């Protein structure tokens, strides 16, 4: 692979792919496959599915590169948009896709939550619980949290990936964050109940052993 391709812009790589240069696809894959995989993993929570989606995305890039319009959307947003559709198709195929109509857009009152719902948990525990909470969100809200908060895309790029207006991204993200915080509170409460039950069971076991001694 030439050094020129390694140093060229994403837009130029897409143009080279459209012109039938396979080495350009290899260069784009090396540069962007980790981003696509990470997005798919955040959305699905399944490494195998994320691997499949990543392969699907770059096959579609090879096919659809001539349709890419520089200036209308960034390559970052374009790839996320393709990945988003691939994730939905994979989840739907596995019968795990929530109905997009199940949770309508709602401008009503948002839940009130604690400022830090994860409290004194360790970093590893916090990350694990955050992942569970994100995966529990309805797809339309999970997407915007992943794109804007985890992937740190701009509102404009997120809107391009989601094929909606930037205002929709902002309002959906506002609600998604509130839903996420509420879910984190619920998960922490569940964990506290689990720990309490475990500790009580240990106390009973210790007491029984002492009585039998």
For each predicted feature, which ranges?
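Sigma70-family region 2
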Residues: 18-19, 42-46, 56-73, 93-95
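Structural recognition of an alpha-helix C-terminal capping motif at a helix-to-coil junction
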Residues: 38, 52-59, 73-85
